[in-house]
Amino acid sequence: MATAQVIAFDESIKFMESIGIENIMQHEADLVEYGQELLQKNNSVKLIGSPKNKGGVLSFTLEGVHPHDIATILDEDGVAIRAGHHCCQILHDKLNIPASARASVGIYNTKDDLDKLNYSINNCKKIFNLKWI
């Protein structure tokens, strides 16, 4: 029996209930809005998806840089993102992009994390000698 996992799951539920699901959802929505505002100012970043009714995810591409390269550079800066098709290759085909980068936010993230994401994306631009803002 997976006793430790059951206990951890129970504690996770208690943690989320102590904060409140609505508060968690609002926190994520606020962070996504802030992140979108930051990244929209960057002329090389293309945000993917509608700003409305979004979960805690910022999907994007960076002109001239493959998402796996973005993920590697951001990792060196201590920023964790995902790169690839994210189990939706058909969507990527429809959008005519080879892959995308995806930053996820949750209750444990802050605006400082998104500032660091933006800083690291600008670092990618420097490394790949892309047009600066």
Regions of interest found by a model, annotated:
Residues 1-133:
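Pyridoxal 5′-phosphate
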